[in-house]
Every structure is written in structure tokens, then in C-alpha cells.
Amino acid sequence: MTNPTVRRGRRAAAVALPLAAGLLLAACASGGSGSNAKEPQTITFSYGPANANDTAYSTLAKDYEAAHPGVTIKVNKISAEVYGQTLQTQMAAGNGPDVMQINSGGGQAGTIGTLGKAGLLLPLTDSSFNSDIPAAERAGYDYNGQLYGVPSATSIDAVIYNDQLAKSDGVTVDATSSLQDVLKQCPAVKSKGKSIFALAGSTPPNTGIMTVEIATSTVYGPNPNWDKDRSSGKTSFEKTKGWHQALQAVVDMNKAGCFQPGAAGAGFADLTNASSSGKAYGFFAPSGAVKSIEDASGGHVKLIALGFPSPAGKNYLSLSSDIGLAGNKKTKSPKLVQDFIKFSVSPAEAKKFAEAQGTIPIGGSLSASDLLPQYQSVAQQLADKQYRTFAVDNWTKPEVYNALGTGVTGLLTGQKTIDDVLKAMDAAWDA
């Protein structure tokens, strides 16, 4: 089960990047229960976009109405800051929407876990949900083995990278690069007063996402079930070679000058200043940040999303699909609700939604033509399914991610060792 505290912290960090950068510079009640009579063809749909100008879900509702004459979907947009608690309160009171935007995982208000545990969500039984949506994208949308929701789009926990700028300076980092390829180039870049990466080293969500991106290749690439092994006591952070490799990669990059000067004490403002001024080529964030930054720049900046170059073996992408749709168990229109949710992940709608969000369409059979320009560099990795679920999406305690993030800051300052960090993560996991 996922803990959305981590998810939301990561999304908030992603929003902070483009906003801070100089680049940007009561639902209608459905009530009741199903009956043998013809279902009502009017349903309610609530969502809470992080960006007030985001119309992706309202467009989805209009598309469904256009394709299904006689159906009416009443859309209710709620502020993202209060959406989760508002949804939880409405659902508990029996007057929640028929369809709702939902966060996968559990542990906070308005998520699959909390609403599923309370028996408030409509089970999704259509076999296509399992056959058409890869397991990596369905992660966190079931409760006790029953599917209750589906993701709306997928993002890469990525290196947001200015490839044009880097190449103009003679620097090459791409989907085939290894960590050694990066390390070899860092000293020359540093000598020019620049860095390959900008890092908010004092901010745990940023140091954390970077390190998990590396561990996706060193830990989860070879063993996709590592989290299950950790939960069952078969392994630990400290005993896993891949976790040592991931943290050693951070130490090596720091020594080679791959981060901007003062990275250990830097915050998001420093990161965005380095990126927007052309002093750094890339930073670490969910890939939806590419669209936000490009839109804010009026098209003057072109970025791509890359996975992190692995220090050992294949490069694996880290995917997260934490925002999706679910239905209300008390809806009077369960067939209509399930059909609308199924429609949301149809190829045409999934592609349209992803384009609006700057993300990747839901679904397992993607070709390069399905992807936005910023994903073309990783199109082959996606086609080859060379990816894993963002590891933290399966961690049950946010303290583990915080121990990683703060621990990496300690590595950067020299106040902690790799063993110190991994022992702290194990302690947080077992607490």
C-alpha cells in the first residue's frame, strides 16, 4: 500500500520548481444505491487540479458526453489544497460524487486506501482494466486485492534536461549514458562555471527523488520485488549492494563537481536559478515539469525527460501514476460510472489527457508517435518496458523517504556515511 504523503510531497516539489523559477516567472449528492430500474444518465464528477488552469478532466467529461448522447456529467472543480479532505468528508457523509479524482495508495484523506478500507468505493470489475493497464501503472489502485481505481496518466521521475544547451557546450547525456559517462564530463563543465546537474541538497524531497532514480536501476531493475523482500525481512537497505551503489553514485558525483557549488545547502530557489540562468543543464523532478516550464517560457526553452544514468547495468526509468479516477459505491449509475472510467483510459482519451498534462499516456503498448517530444529520447525504453514503479510508491512510511533525503544531505556535507544513511532507513522502516 502506498503512502501519499510521499507522493504529494514529491508533486508539491515539482510544482515549486516551475513556479519559483525565473522561467514562470460541495459536490452534488449521488446518494442511494443501485436498483433494477434503468440507471440515471446524469452523474457527478469531482476533481482537484494542482494547476487552476488545468482542464484535462473537464475535457474528458465533455468528450464522453459527445460520444454518448443523453449522458450528462456535472463537473465540480475543488481547490487542490482542500480536495482530499473535502472528498473524504463528502464520501463519509454519503453525498460524495459518482466519479472522483483520487490519489493511489493510503494513509491520508481521499485516497484509495482510506476510502477503500471504509467500503465507499465501487469495485472495478471489467477485465480490460487489468489487461490494458500495466501493473507498474496500476500500483496503489487496489485494496485487499480488489481494484477500485485507475491511473489517468504516467510520469517519469526524471532528470529534466536542457539537451540543446548541453550539446552546445559539448556535453552529451542521453538514455544510453552510464554514470561513468557523466562523471568523466563533470570536471570540464565545472571549469566553465557550470554543472551538469542542479540539486536542492538541503531539501529532502529533491535529494530523495534523485537517489531513488538511481536505485531504480541498481536495486529495482535486478529485483522488482525488493520492497516485498524488505517487508518480509529477507533483506534490508544496509545489506543490499544496489542501495550502496546508489548512494556511492551521489558521493562520486559530488566529488567530481557534477552539482552546482554549494549544492549541499541549496534550496529550490538555488536549483531553479541555476537551471534558468543556464548554469546547470538538468535537475531532478517528475517529468510533468517539462510542460510547465516550457509553457511558462513561451516556447523559448526546450527540455527533455531522461532516466538517471546507471552506475551498474541497464538504465531503468522510474514511473509514477499517482493520480487517477474511482467510483462511488453508492452511485445509482454503477454501469455508467464504470464505463466512464473505462473511457478515460481508452487510447485516444489517454493520449489527449497526457498531452494536456505533459505526461505519458496510460497503457502498455506505446509507440514513439504516442509520446510528446520531451519523451522521444526514452521512447525505446518505454517500448521495451525498461522501467519500474517509483520505489517510494510502495513504501508504507514517509519517514523512510525522509531518512533517505536527509541522509543524502549528510553525505554531501560529509557528516554521514553510506552505512549511516542505510541504517537510518532500516530503522525508519522497522519503527
At which residue positions do the language-model features occur?
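C-terminal capping/gating helix-and-loop segments adjacent to ligand/active sites or protein-protein/ligand interfaces
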Residues: Q357-G364, S377-D430
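Hinge/lid segment of periplasmic solute-binding proteins
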Residues: G105-D157, M210, G298, A305
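Extracytoplasmic/periplasmic substrate-recognition and gating elements
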Residues: A66, E294-Q357, K416
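Short, low-complexity disordered leader/linker segments with a strong preference
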Residues: M1-T44, A66, F129, A427-A431
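Glycine-centered hinge/linker elements that transmit conformational signals in sensory
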Residues: R230-A263
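Extracytoplasmic "Venus flytrap"/periplasmic binding protein-like
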Residues: D63, A67-I133, K167-G170, S275, ...
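Short, well-ordered beta-strand elements
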Residues: K38-A50, V71-N76, D98-V99, Y148, ...
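Extracytoplasmic/periplasmic solute-binding protein
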Residues: Y148-P151, L183-T235
